[in-house]
Amino acid sequence: MTKKYFGTDGIRGRVGEFPITPDFMLKLGWAAGMAFRSMGACRVLVGKDTRISGYMFESALEAGLSAAGADVMLLGPMPTPAIAYLTRTFHAEAGIVISASHNPHDDNGIKFFSGEGTKLPDEVELMIEELLDAPMTVVESSKLGKVSRINDASGRYIEFCKSSVPSSTSFAGLKVVLDCAHGATYKVAPSVFRELGAQVTVLSAQPNGLNINENCGSTHMSQLQAAVLAEHADLGIAFDGDGDRVLMVDQTGAIVDGDELLFIIARDLHERDKLQGGVVGTLMSNLGLELALADLGIPFVRANVGDRYVIAELLERNWLVGGENSGHIVCFRHATTGDAIIAALQVLMALKARGESLAQSRQGLRKCPQVLVNVRFGGGENPVEHPAVKEACERVTAAMAGRGRVLLRKSGTEPLVRVMVEGDDEAQVRAYAEELAKLVAEVSA
């Protein structure tokens, strides 16, 4: 059954435009509360990133949940993976995150976690959607939900992150620059790395509600690159606005993407005989990652794009590590969802174990040239399914004669078609990508 509101990563859009409006959030809170209550007693955690609209939507969700008889525990600004973790530790029935992740401040959205700290099953999302179309009724006064605020949430999560590395671990002597994207990691990330002994310089940790992801964080890396060079740091770590993506910069100022970080983590676990199975990537993962893992004898499979699909594949195979080149990295030994801080700590542990710098460690993966072009798509017929686009993709694939890949897909979170071409000749790959992107734009007009 097709979902009306939920995309690949919850519900997301422009603030003030349906469905990202206060009245819809009120009804969504009620519908979610009714759905969760139908499964038993109900406590729901609610957290958010640092967008100014988060306060408005927090109040609306709180009212809707209470009207359905659900007790609400407010966490304030916290990373998305922290809310997944705290939902489990408080034994709540569900967690809700108010965030649009790496998007600008005038977007916002809602993500749900189950009581196990994982994404909601499809059947629960469909139940919520059915209730959204039903009349809203308030439970009797004696059954209204209570609302409380959790004041020590940050401290709990900081200790959880630190527990993902051995208690004897010290990063003393390591000089690190953190870019917190003026987002949800702005308090907790500096504390985690400082308490583990690193010398930390912090960028973009002064959120004002409007500057989240603005020319900073994992989607705008130039500030971090410059700071790593200026500070003569060993490496830089960039988070996105809600703390579920991480990218890095080595001491030369070069960007280290999610594929490379995933390789470093997986190789370390493999060398310590702790990998358990193989690695899950996505359709967008660089071919070089697959080849490098194969050289180590590590199985690799591709899931659809989106961390929920990576997680589903990990669960099905009982594997522990997966991720996306965008920086969503899942380390199931420690967390139930993509966690940027924990992933970064696993990378630092791997570097420490091998006695290597980040620049040295990334050399184990030789990436194939890959060009990604985003084409704005206003709606209507999916251009990926257009006959002319399909024919062009087949022609380009045939021309690369088994030495490359073509992937076109509609984004699940933004009005974009992503055109990706990968092969062994960078100039040719770029030409093919631009040709296909131009065609997609033409058929979308």
Swiss-Prot record:
> Where along the chain is the active site annotated?
S101
Its cofactor is:
Mg(2+)
Instruction: List the EC numbers from the record.
Output: 5.4.2.10
Return the cofactor note field: Binds 1 Mg(2+) ion per subunit.
Q: Which CDD domains match?
A: GlmM
Task: Tell me the domain of life.
Answer: Bacteria
Give the record's keywords alphabetically. Isomerase, Magnesium, Metal-binding, Phosphoprotein
Q: Where does Mg(2+) bind?
A: S101, D240, D242, D244
Q: Which GO terms describe its biological process?
A: carbohydrate metabolic process; peptidoglycan biosynthetic process; UDP-N-acetylglucosamine biosynthetic process
Q: Which HAMAP family does the protein's record reference?
A: GlmM_B
What does the function comment of this entry state?
Answer: Catalyzes the conversion of glucosamine-6-phosphate to glucosamine-1-phosphate.
For this entry, the protein name equals: Phosphoglucosamine mutase
Organism of this sequence: Pseudomonas fluorescens (strain ATCC BAA-477 / NRRL B-23932 / Pf-5)
What gene is this protein translated from? glmM
